[in-house]
Amino acid sequence: MGSDADDKIREIVELAKLYDIYGDMLSDHNRVVFEDYVLNNYSLGEIAGEVDISRQGVRDIVVRCSGKLRRYEEKLGFLKKINETEAALNEMEDMINAGNTDPEIILYCVRKARETLVK
């Protein structure tokens, strides 16, 4: 039971991150509808009344925008790079917090973080 809710939360977080990166590539109208549904948690009915379209029209826009954002990520991969860089930096932070301040290991982590940005 909790798994479906967890999956929905993960999907919303992913869409919010994709929107932060690629949202400006959506039309103004689509951006308003997507923001209201995904980021502001408005219902389809609330948005439909606000922008004067049907609830099905709102749903179609949200689905279409979600697909566009995912396709942008497939082609450009900015979120993947951000996540990989964050993981490399977290690894470096964990090593330092564990008392491992060997310059060679820290340099390795810095290079690893840099690689995630340039590949």
Where are these regions (language model features)?
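Short, Lys/Arg-enriched N-terminal segment that forms or immediately precedes the first helix
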Residues: 7-22
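Intrinsically disordered, low-complexity basic tails/linkers immediately adjacent to helix-turn-helix/homeobox/MYB/SANT
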Residues: 76-101
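Hydrophobic positions on the alpha-helical face of helix-turn-helix-like DNA-binding modules
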Residues: 33, 47-48, 58
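Helix-turn-helix DNA-binding motif, specifically the short coil turn and the N-cap/start of the second
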Residues: 54-55
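C-terminal flanking helix
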Residues: 66-73
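Residues within the DNA-recognition helix of helix-turn-helix
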Residues: 61-64
